[in-house]
Curated annotation (Swiss-Prot):
Disulfide bonds: none annotated. It is a multi-pass membrane protein. The chain crosses the membrane at residues 15-35, 87-107, 109-129, 144-161, 164-184, 193-213, 224-244, 281-301, 316-336, 360-380, 395-415. This is Polyprenol-phosphate-mannose-dependent alpha-(1-2)-phosphatidylinositol mannoside mannosyltransferase. The lineage of its organism: Bacteria, Bacillati, Actinomycetota, Actinomycetes, Mycobacteriales.
Length: 440
């Protein structure tokens, strides 16, 4: 019933499919409500939300966020630094006026909604289930129901999504800003504004500038960079001392974010650190590996963007964005497993293409990705004793990285190498006319 291709459902659908759809909606609603109760019914302590609130409170009180080794004493008993740019502390300030349970509930509920929104946007760009006679609901609503049905179990069973909620992280918020800006065919705002804001809130989304560069969309790339700069300057205007400290000192100190050897640090840097290599050879190997993965990503994304059939034109931008997202995760100095919330949209993409193309490769990627996130092998690495683990445990414990490599390679191999007949970004313009800042 839930057709995952662009073919129209048979006309004259009987009563049974309609009833099945209503049952599906009821089950999905029940699943989302159950997940909501799990997350909000008895609000657990979420340590990162605690730090966010204290960062916002420090800014409101005029206390330093970073200077003199500023540390925040969490209710969980750990002393942690504030690792985001000053603009993020300003954004978190309203939550400082709320109690910790209320702030936790607000951020958690927002995260759940945005996860459904992000998944809906991906399904829409992939043109999933565009026509049907089963229901009169518009396509976007059908896709939202499908997205909710995917998100509900993901929150409980997929390790990156589950841990994101357990810590109270904002990775889903950042991911949604990126997806909403990059994936739709058109946006009601000049494309690049949301990505620029995401970069100003946390530096890691800057990797998606590569996406617009690969699309040769220089106008949007420059608009994104300008937005990030303007937003960061707003941080200087509102928190001058903290901004100077962050951009001149703190931003270079990645050690304050956490120990690279921890098993949940799923990236190249973590894999090398766990081998026990010295700092100099490890840095050289990391740089070489990053350039190699960059070359692989550029190759795969460009092949995806050169597709010239109707299906590939629909899929190409999403495939390219997936490559860039995975590249950013594996080359970042720190990529905790809860940063890998991109696993959900990537799995949605591989599952849709596995069905649509009857692809063994995408089917294998989907199955492997689900297995790795549901039965995570990260725990094969003994926590805080990762460098003593055997080689096979180290390889298995870094499985997110190897899966990401496999996804990028498969996208490059299966994508058409034929040249697109039109401009790379002509179908992805925002609705805003040129006079108001048309995105190129």
């Amino acid at each position: 019933m839930l057709e995952m291709s662009k073919r129209q459902s048979p006309r004259g659908a009987g009563l049974a499919p309609t009833i099945a759809w209503r049952v599906f909606q009821l089950l999905t609603l029940a699943g989302v409500l159950w997940v909501g109760w799990r997350l909000l019914g008895r609000v657990p302590y979420r340590i990162d939300i605690d730090v966010y609130r204290m960062g916002g409170r420090a800014w409101l009180d005029g206390r330093p966020l970073y200077a003199d080794g500023a540390i925040f004493h969490t209710q969980g008993g750990l002393d942690l630094p504030f690792t985001y740019p000053p603009l993020a502390a300003i954004a978190f300030a309203p939550f400082a006026w709320l109690s910790l349970p209320l702030a936790s509930s607000a951020i958690t509920a927002t995260t759940l909604v945005l996860l459904i929104v992000a998944t809906t946007i991906v399904l829409t760009r992939l043109d999933v289930w565009p026509h049907t006679t089963v229901t009169s609901e518009p396509a976007w609503m059908r896709r939202a129901w499908l997205a909710a049905a995917m998100v509900a179990p993901a929150v409980i069973y997929l390790e990156p999504i589950r841990s994101n909620f357990e810590f109270g992280q904002i990775n889903v918020v950042l991911m949604t800003l990126v997806i909403a800006d990059c994936v739709p065919r058109r946006t009601p705002w000049p494309r690049g504004l949301l990505l620029g804001l995401a970069i100003a809130l946390k530096l890691t989304p800057a990797v998606f500038l590569l996406y617009f560069l690969l699309r040769r969309d220089i106008h949007t790339l420059l608009r994104t960079a300008a937005t990030a700069v303007v937003a960061s300057l707003a941080g200087f205007a509102l928190a001058w001392s903290d901004s100077v400290e962050y951009w001149t000192e703190t931003v270079r100190n990645t050690d304050r974010i956490g120990t690279a050897t921890l098993n949940t640090n799923q990236n190249i840097a973590g894999a090398l650190a766990r081998l026990g290599l010295g700092e100099s050879p490890r840095f050289i190997l990391w740089v070489l590996a990053c350039f190699a993965v960059l070359a692989l990503t550029v190759w795969a994304a460009r092949r995806a963007l050169r597709g010239d059939t109707a299906d590939q034109t629909t899929e190409a931008p999403v495939l390219a964005l997936v490559c860039v997202a995975l590249f950013g995760l594996v080359v970042s100095p720190v990529s905790w497993s809860h940063h890998w919330v991109w696993m959900l949209p990537v799995l949605v993409v591989t599952a849709v293409l596995a069905y649509r193309r009857r692809s063994v490769w995408f089917t294998a990627l989907t199955a492997a990705g689900l297995a790795l996130t549901v039965w995570t092998p990260i725990t094969l690495l003994p926590e805080h004793r990762e460098t003593t683990a055997s080689l096979w445990r180290q390889l298995a414990g870094g499985s997110y990285v190897w899966w990401a490599f496999a996804v990028i390679v498969v996208i490059g191999l299966v994508s058409s190498s034929r040249t697109h007949t039109g401009d790379a970004h002509e179908t992805d313009e925002p609705l805003v006319p040129l006079a108001r800042g048309e995105a190129g």
